[in-house]
Design a protein with these regions (language model features):
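C-terminal lobe and adjacent flexible extensions of AdoMet/dcAdoMet transferase-like proteins
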Residues: 196, 214-225
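Catalytic cores of RNA-modifying enzymes
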Residues: 1-214
Length: 225
């Protein structure tokens, strides 16, 4: 059944306050799933599964999924759609306040079409606080993706670029047309992969990141004055 079927069945209305734009193109969901490249022993945490387009493709590959969805109506839809599937846990909770310490056991992979309104804040939180997530396959606003992979002396380079260069190997994978969503977003989307590196000097790197934030803040103040 198509994503439009599920949207219409429960009369789902995207909420702008949650930055909701539902992925309806199963070809894109499949391309994202192929980038996961995990072992079946690697459990997946999916943030913002929405109507379950990406969730459905991940389940076809027999991944074990913990899906975190803040919207109660969408949580109901997901439970109706996947309630009989044994290897998925659907959690109605805000990804920003979710207790990630429960991600125990083997390394985790995070997959998701991140809501535009929390994408940057959530990624910074996860990279700095949740080392057990070792790989990310995510879609987010193209400008944020460009900032993550930006190199020094380029337009998008900033403190977030420093953070991800210190702790990860991040790569842009492909852009996603606005036509792949319902409703169509006004901003462009990009899929990227982030591999968190295992580091022995994380404390030093955190200090370097904090110094970079101060430096960029001072730079912005000078530009304003």
């Amino acid at each position: 059944m198509s994503e439009i079927f599920w949207i219409n069945k429960l009369n789902i209305k995207p909420r702008k306050t949650l930055g909701q734009n539902f992925l309806i193109d199963t070809n894109i969901s499949r391309k994202i799933t192929k980038l996961v490249q995990g072992q079946l022993a690697d459990p997946i945490i999916e943030i913002g599964p929405g109507t379950g387009s990406l969730t459905n493709e991940l389940l076809k590959d027999n991944y074990r999924i913990k899906a975190v969805e803040v919207d109660k109506q969408l949580t109901h839809l997901l439970r109706e759609r996947f309630g009989d599937v044994p290897n998925i846990e659907i959690i109605n909770e805000d990804a920003m306040s979710f207790d990630y310490s429960q991600l125990t056991g083997p390394w985790w992979i995070m997959v998701g079409n991140l809501p535009y309104n929390i994408g940057t804040r959530l990624l910074i939180k996860l990279i700095t606080e949740v080392p057990q997530i070792h790989r990310y396959v995510i879609m987010l606003q193209d400008e944020v993706a460009e900032r993550i992979v930006a190199k020094p002396n380029t337009k998008h380079y900033g403190s977030i670029s420093v953070l991800f260069s210190l702790f990860t190997d991040s790569k842009l994978q492909f852009n996603v047309s606005n036509n792949c969503f319902e409703p169509k977003p006004k901003i462009l989307s990009t899929v990227l992969t982030i591999q968190r590196e295992t580091l022995v000097d994380e404390e030093i790197r955190f200090k370097a990141f904090e110094i970079s934030k101060i430096a960029f803040q001072q730079k912005r103040k000078k530009i304003k004055t």
